[in-house]
From Swiss-Prot:
ATP binds at residues 86-93. CDD domains: Khc_CBD_cc, KISc_KHC_KIF5. Residues 991-1003 have a biased composition (Polar residues). This is Kinesin heavy chain isoform 5A. Residues 907-1032 are annotated as: Globular. InterPro entries: Kinesin-like_fam (IPR027640), Kinesin_motor_CS (IPR019821), Kinesin_motor_dom (IPR001752), Kinesin_motor_dom_sf (IPR036961), P-loop_NTPase (IPR027417). The modification N-acetylalanine is found at residue 2. Changing residue 280 to L: In SPG10; pure form. Residues 978-989 have a biased composition (Low complexity). It comes from Homo sapiens (Human). Microtubule-dependent motor required for slow axonal transport of neurofilament proteins (NFH, NFM and NFL). Can induce formation of neurite-like membrane protrusions in non-neuronal cells in a ZFYVE27-dependent manner. The ZFYVE27-KIF5A complex contributes to the vesicular transport of VAPA, VAPB, SURF4, RAB11A, RAB11B and RTN3 proteins in neurons. Required for anterograde axonal transportation of MAPK8IP3/JIP3 which is essential for MAPK8IP3/JIP3 function in axon elongation.
Length: 1032
């Protein structure tokens, strides 16, 4: 039911595109002059529209200025239409579609798709929306479904409200802007386009994108519906400009024919006086009948070219827009009343009918009093408004003007006349009703006859089409079976490949684990070595302290002994001092040897640097010679080309001379024949013989002179050709020689380059050795200083010890030598102390050696530590690469799974092509239940189980790789102990899956009622998945 009628005019907007490159190169002028926002002047004549857009207007400005309001109207229950009309290459498709996925350049259709859902999400949550779209084109005056290319000749019918619609057109239910854009992309790829002289992407058909929106208030049960037609008309063409021919020419004829029918409809509606509007002249005007003068709010874009080259077409387009601006539409809300509203309306109409019946009864009573000759006073008469209402209600009942005349007749005759009048009135009413019924029946039969004719034609076409497609469908059935077998085989191969990849990933994981274990062992070894080094250092320090304490104690004992013994000389450990001095000398010799080696290495490095500079200089000289040779070769090649061209011209001249020679020979033969004729004639005419001889001699002399000149010219040309040939041969030899020299120079250059590379490598090695020698030199210098300090300290201690012992011995000798028995014990004690001193000296020497060994071992340990750190970094990099490889394999397998899902979905959708669609309700304030990866909201069971098994294996790998990152897993509560034990090949292990409740759950679906794909006695357990939220 429709109510709330509003009369509105068609909104006409004019848009000019910029001059294109071809028009700029042709020098066309920019002819429009813009006056304000609603007027443009072409050729001195102003044209006024609702809005005029100059060339610098952006797509967003166009949409906000005129197309945004129509979205609100459609959501409020009105029908809407947006046209794009104009000549070819005027920017219609750019205005309607633009670049679909570019936020700046997208046209009206993608912006409307986005805006519809933005409005829905901001509306009351009690509203539920059902949105379906269809996309078709009118090509060669045939309706072709762009979403199902097998439907090539659809027919136009009318619904119960006599609104035209395309029967059998594919309708897709959508729940997000991305799904609408996917539908547009699919239809756009099937639309007919061609290349013409005026447009590289010329549309060869009229496209209509229909959005049907139905909404229902869940509380009040009120239902509204609105349709939005988005029409991109093909441009009118002038064959002389587009250069159309062949099939493109036939397309242009049909385009111009349908646009002419549209112009006739616009003209008939603009005049307003014609009772017949030719909607049926074209299928396009038939489909858009409601948009032109019907129940719709229509906006028309007239797209124009600003070039002076298209002046006539631009004026015609502007005049078309002015005519369309005068058309009036009657837009009304498409409202379906609820039972309560129908009840209220029925009660209201019932009360109105009751009041009208009471008024009629009063009027009939007053009329009967007048007919009876009674005079009705004014107080008893009905009021004017009630009388007018009664007249409106009873206007179908004719009243005799003479009935108010008072006639005195008998009551019986009056009653007889009244009955006769009532009978006649009743017959008259019956006849009127019968006439109306018959006229309605005639109209209905006419319409049924037209519908039957159309149905007969379409049925014949459908019958032929069905007969043609029957065999095609049989072949397609066989092909589909083969494709199913191929898909199953591909799935089996994919399963085998997945097993192999899984094994490879497990091997990589094991290798990574081994490397991690090795790394931990290396780290533990390094820590133990560090602790051992620290312990040795502590032991060395402790021993040094002990040696110092022992020396101090020894000094005390010797001082006491010198007091007791006297001035006896003490034998010093000369062998120890000699050993220390010998070791020090060996160290000095080793250091001097290293210095000499370093000097020789530095000298060798300098020589190599000089040699490298010399090689670079030679390479530069060789490069310059090579470039000069290449220049000389290019010059000789140019000279050879010029000589070749000259030879060709000489050959051509020679050919011309030979042709002229042949023509002269022919002329000579003709002259000889004529001479023979003349000789014969001269025999008859002897008086003229002398003249003929003179003529003959003259001709012979002339021919001889021509022949000699020709021979001279031929000889001269032959000589020139021989000279040029010699020159060419010499140049070829020279070119070959230069080519050989160039190859030789290139070989020398490559050789020098390789030598330079080898020398640079050696230089790098020597530099590395030099750096190592410098480091060793520094280490040895430090070691030498440390040893020198230790030896100096030890030498000083020995000197002090010897001096102290000597002084004490002298003092003890000066004392009384009476106790001779104690001297022997004292000597034994001195020898004991000397032995202890010798042992301490050996221990000190051993500690110095150990220290030197540790210093030598320290760089090795540091190098090993660096190598271990590098190994750790390499292992970390390998681990990271393994993770990335696993993720890439995961994405690749996911893409393969999506492709297989799409193939299975396409097959299943092809099988259920004629079944009912399931609407996907859209609630305001919520996001769609489906995602871009799941556009139809369903998944085949095979793909569900296979995808779940894939993701479960990836979860296990991810758990092995990163056991600590449990918050980023795709699954929860993974039952890793359950394995697949089903049979039926590699594919069956991925297809047979169940949960505790026996249902398989798709990871991209938020439903839990999908049936399991394959039933078996022993099914593998399916891992429970997280349910996706509506926002994802």
């Amino acid at each position: 039911m429709a109510e709330t009628n509003n009369e509105c005019s068609i909104k006409v907007l004019c848009r000019f595109r910029p001059l294109n490159q071809a028009e700029i190169l042709r020098g066309d002028k920019f002819i429009p002059i813009f006056q304000g926002d609603d007027s443009v002047v072409i050729g001195g004549k102003p044209y006024v529209f609702d809005r005029v857009f100059p060339p610098n207007t952006t797509q967003e400005q166009v949409y906000h200025a005129c197309a945004m309001q129509i979205v609100k109207d459609v959501l409020a229950g009105y029908n809407g239409t947006i046209f794009a009309y104009g000549q070819t290459s005027s920017g219609k498709t750019h205005t309607m579609e633009g670049k679909l996925h570019d936020p700046q350049l997208m046209g009206i259709i993608p912006r409307i798709a986005r805006d519809i859902f933005n409005h829905i999400y901001s509306m009351d949550e009690n509203l539920e929306f059902h949105i379906k779209v269809s996309y078709f084109e009118i090509y060669l005056d045939k309706i072709r479904d762009l979403l199902d290319v097998t439907k090539t000749n659809l027919s136009v019918h009318e619904d119960k409200n006599r609104v035209p619609f395309v029967k059998g057109c594919t309708e897709r239910f959508v729940s997000s802007p991305e799904e609408i854009l996917d539908v547009i992309d699919e239809g756009k790829s099937n639309r007919h386009v061609a290349v013409t002289n005026m447009n590289e992407h010329s549309s060869r058909s009229h496209s209509i994108f229909l959005i049907n929106i139905k909404q229902e208030n869940m509380e009040t049960e009120q239902k509204l519906s609105g349709k939005l037609y988005l029409v991109d008309l093909a441009g009118s063409e002038k064959v002389s400009k587009t250069g159309a021919e062949g099939a493109v020419l036939d397309e242009a004829k049909n385009i111009n024919k349908s646009l002419s029918a549209l112009g006739n409809v616009i003209s008939a509606l603009a005049e307003g006086t014609k009772s017949y509007v030719p909607y049926r002249d074209s299928k396009m005007t038939r489909i858009l009948q409601d948009s032109l003068g019907g129940n719709c709010r229509t906006t028309m874009f007239i797209c124009c070219s600003p070039s002076s080259y298209n002046d006539a077409e631009t004026k015609s387009t502007l005049m078309f827009g002015q005519r369309a601006k005068t058309i009036k539409n009657t837009a009304s809300v498409n409202l379906e009343l609820t039972a309560e509203q129908w009840k209220k309306k029925y009660e209201k109409e019932k009360e109105k009918t009751k009041a009208q019946k009471e008024t009629i009864a009063k009027l009939e009573a007053e009329l009967s009093r007048w007919r009876n000759g009674e005079n009705v006073p004014e107080t008893e008469r009905l009021a004017g408004e009630e009388a007018a209402l009664g007249a409106e209600l009873c206007e179908e009942t004719p009243v005799n003007d003479n009935s108010s005349i008072v006639v005195r007749i008998a009551p019986e005759e009056r009653q007889k006349y009244e009955e006769e009048i009532r009978r006649l009135y009743k017959q008259l009413d019956d006849k009127d009703d019968e006439i109306n019924q018959q006229s309605q029946l005639i109209e209905k039969l006419k319409q049924q006859m037209l519908d039957q004719e159309e149905l007969l034609v379409s049925t014949r076409g459908d019958n032929e089409k069905v007969q043609r497609e029957l065999s095609h469908l049989q072949s397609e059935n066989d092909a589909a079976k083969d494709e199913v077998k191929e898909v199953l085989q591909a799935l089996e191969e994919l399963a085998v490949n997945y097993d192999q990849k899984s094994q490879e990933v497990e091997e990589k994981s094991q290798q990574n684990q081994l490397l991690v274990d090795e790394l931990s062992q290396k780290v533990a070894t390094m820590l133990s070595l560090e602790s051992e080094l620290q312990r040795l250092q502590e032991v060395s320090g402790h021993q040094r302290k002990r040696i110092a304490e022992v020396l101090n104690g020894l000094m005390k004992d010797l001082s006491e002994f010198s007091v007791i013994v006297g001035n006896g000389e003490i034998k010093l450990p000369v062998e120890i001092s000699g050993a220390i001095e010998e070791e020090f000398t060996v160290a000095r010799l080793y250091i001097s040897k290293i210095k000499s080696e370093v000097k020789s290495v530095v000298k060798r490095c300098r020589q190599l640097e000089n040699l490298q500079v010399e090689c670079h200089r030679k390479m530069e000289v060789t490069g310059r010679e090579l470039s000069s040779c290449q220049l000389l070769i290019s010059q000789h090649e140019a000279k050879i080309r010029s000589l070749t061209e000259y030879m060709q011209s000489v050959e051509l001249k020679k050919r011309h001379l030979e042709e002229s020679y042949d023509s002269l020979s022919d002329e000579l033969a003709k002259l000889q024949a004529q001479e023979t004729v003349h000789e014969v004639a001269l025999k008859d005419k002897e008086p003229d013989t002398q003249d003929a001889d003179e003529v003959k001699k003259a001709l012979e002399l002339q021919m001889e002179s021509h022949r000699e000149a020709h021979h001279r010219q031929l000889a001269r040309l032959r000589d020139e050709i021989n000279e040029k040939q010699k020159t060419i041969d010499e140049l070829k030899d020279l070119n070959q020689k230069l080519q050989l020299e160039l190859e030789k120079l290139q070989a020398d250059y490559e050789k020098l380059k390789s030598e330079e590379h080898e020398k640079s490598t050696k230089l790098q090695e020597l530099t590395f050795l030099y750096e190592r020698h410098e480091q060793s030199k520094q280490d040895l210098k430090g070691l030498e200083e440390t040893v020198a300090r230790e030896l100096q300290t030890l030498h000083n201690l020995r000197k002090l010890f010897v001096q102290d012992v000597t002084t004490r011995v002298k003092k003890s000798a000066e004392m009384e030598p009476e106790d001779s028995g104690g001297i022997h014990s004292q000597k034994q004690k001195i020898s004991f102390l000397e032995n202890n001193l010798e042992q301490l000296t050996k221990v000190h020497k051993q500690l110095v050696r150990d220290n030197a060994d540790l210093r030598c071992e320290l760089p090795k340990l540091e190098k090993r530590l660096r190598a271990t750190a590098e190994r750790v970094k390499a292992l970390e990099g390998a681990l990271k690469e393994a993770k990335e490889g696993a993720m890439k394999d995961k994405r690749r397998y996911q893409q393969e799974v999506d492709r297989i899902k799409e193939a299975v979905r396409y097959k299943s959708s092809g099988k259920r092509g004629h079944s009912a669609q399931i609407a996907k309700p859209v609630r305001p304030g919520h996001y769609p239940a489906s995602s871009p990866t799941n556009p139809y909201g369903t998944r085949s069971p095979e793909c569900i189980s296979y995808t779940n098994s894939l993701f479960q294996n990836y979860q296990n790998l991810y758990l092995q790789a990163t056991p600590s990152s449990t918050s980023d897993m795709y699954f929860a509560n993974s039952c890793t102990s359950s394995g697949a034990t089903s049979s039926g090949g590699p594919l069956a292990s991925y297809q047979k899956a169940n949960m505790d409740n026996g249902n398989a759950t798709d990871i991209n679906d938020n439903r839990s009622d999908l049936p399991c794909g394959y039933e078996a006695e022993d099914q593998a357990k399916l891992f429970p998945l997280h349910q996706e939220t509506a926002a994802s």
